[in-house]
Each structure stands twice: as structure tokens, then as C-alpha cells.
Swiss-Prot record:
It catalyses: a quinone + NADH + 5 H(+)(in) = a quinol + NAD(+) + 4 H(+)(out). InterPro entries: NADH_UbQ_OxRdtase_chain4L/K (IPR001133), NUOK/Mnh_C1-like (IPR039428). The chain crosses the membrane at residues 1-21, 28-48, 64-84. Keywords: Cell inner membrane, Cell membrane, Membrane, NAD, Quinone, Translocase, Transmembrane, Transmembrane helix, Transport, Ubiquinone. This is NADH-quinone oxidoreductase subunit K. Pfam families: Oxidored_q2 (PF00420). It is found in: Cell inner membrane. It comes from Helicobacter pylori (strain Shi470). GO terms for molecular function: NADH:ubiquinone reductase (non-electrogenic) activity; quinone binding. HAMAP family: NDH1_NuoK. Signal peptide: none annotated. Its EC number is 7.1.1.-. GO terms for cellular component: NADH dehydrogenase complex; plasma membrane. It is an enzyme of class 7 (translocase).
Length: 100
């Protein structure tokens, strides 16, 4: 039988993969993907704990995170497209070329 520990281990591993992607990658698009992996790992943890404690708060919070992540992707992808049109690169090191 799959217990709570198994879900939390998978959630922790996914979060570590996302964190490693955030620290290792220089591409803005891959940073967004890594952020989404970390958010999904958090959702797995919330839903697993919610299921095993018979409390719906974790599931409601996971739905809220999904909604926030969807809006983040919509806004972030729009900004990435504009960034690529202007600078022809998605490299994070070119961020210091911004003037403000």
C-alpha cells in the first residue's frame, strides 16, 4: 500500500529537481518550467497530507496554487515572448542589459 511517506518523498524529490533547475539553468523559459515543477511538488504534498488527515484544506489550497500558477504562466510567457522579440535571446545573463 502506498502511504503518506511515499507521496511526501516524491514531492520532495520533485521539489529538489525544480530547485536544481532554478539554480543550474540560465534560460528564462527553463526557469519558469522549474518553478512550475516546484509548485506541482508542493501541490502533491498538500493533497497527500489532506487525504491522509481527512481535511479538505490542503486540497483547497492546492487548487488556489494551481490558479495562481496558471496566471503566473500566462503573464510570464508573455514577458518571455516580448523579451525574446527585443533581445533575440532568453539567456538570464542578458538581464543586465535592461535599462531602467
Amino acid at each position: 500500500m502506498i502511504g503518506l511517506n511515499h507521496y511526501l518523498i516524491v514531492s520532495g524529490l520533485l521539489f529538489c529537481i525544480g530547485l536544481a533547475g532554478m539554480l543550474k539553468r540560465k534560460n528564462i523559459l527553463l526557469l519558469f518550467f522549474s518553478t512550475e515543477i516546484m509548485l506541482n511538488a508542493i501541490n502533491i504534498g498538500f493533497v497527500a497530507i489532506s487525504k491522509y488527515t481527512h481535511n479538505l484544506d490542503g486540497q483547497m489550497f492546492a487548487l488556489f496554487i494551481i490558479a495562481i500558477a496558471a496566471s503566473e504562466v500566462a503573464i510570464g510567457l508573455g514577458l518571455v515572448i516580448l523579451w525574446f522579440k527585443k533581445f533575440k535571446s532568453l539567456d538570464i545573463d542578458s538581464l543586465n542589459a535592461m535599462k531602467g
